[in-house]
Amino acid sequence: MDLRKKIRIVENFPIEGISFKDVTPILKDPKAMKHTTKEIAKYLEDKNVDVVVGPEARGFLFGVPVAHELDIGFVPVRKPGKLPYKTFSVDYALEYGSDSLEIHSDGIEKGQNVAIVDDLLATGGTVLGVSKLVEKLGGHVSALNFVIELTELKGRDKLKGYDIQSLVKYDL
């Protein structure tokens, strides 16, 4: 299946000059969603992954089905103040400024192999922050999996040393 045909391009969203890659048509199409889930799960089959981690919000949409396909658990990573139990946090750099992410303190067990699943790899800042959280808890990041990669933003450069999968690549 050509997933590129299922990704809607919305020009000038959320601001002028941005060409937004909208994954909601994949979510709406059960065959496209199943294909996406199976492609990521197939990539992870030989990586001995114990748990899938996904950043809010679209990481939840793809991470949970992948975890179910692999018959393993899912751990959410959220913005500060959104998780009800004790958390660990990390600050990470954005293109202009910084942000924070949190994970439950018991979300990852020491030595667990973790796949981080998200919809989009752009600059790599968010997933690098998520990776640091996983590693802070003693987990090993086995793979970073994305539906879309915006290659010109060079997120891969920031993620050297990690095993990266992206299903669809766009040059800006």
UniProtKB/Swiss-Prot annotation:
Keywords: Cytoplasm, Glycosyltransferase, Purine salvage, Transferase. It is found in: Cytoplasm. InterPro entries: Ade_phspho_trans, PRibTrfase_dom, PRTase-like, UPRTase/APRTase. It comes from the Archaea. Gene3D superfamilies: 3.40.50.2020. It catalyses: AMP + diphosphate = 5-phospho-alpha-D-ribose 1-diphosphate + adenine. Pathway: Purine metabolism; AMP biosynthesis via salvage pathway; AMP from adenine: step 1/1. GO terms for molecular function: adenine binding; adenine phosphoribosyltransferase activity; AMP binding. Its EC number is 2.4.2.7. One of its GO terms (biological process) is adenine salvage. One of its GO terms (cellular component) is cytoplasm. SUPFAM superfamilies: PRTase-like. Catalyzes a salvage reaction resulting in the formation of AMP, that is energically less costly than de novo synthesis. Belongs to the purine/pyrimidine phosphoribosyltransferase family. PANTHER family: ADENINE PHOSPHORIBOSYLTRANSFERASE. This is Adenine phosphoribosyltransferase. The lineage of its organism: Archaea, Methanobacteriati, Methanobacteriota, Methanomada group, Methanococci. The gene is apt2.
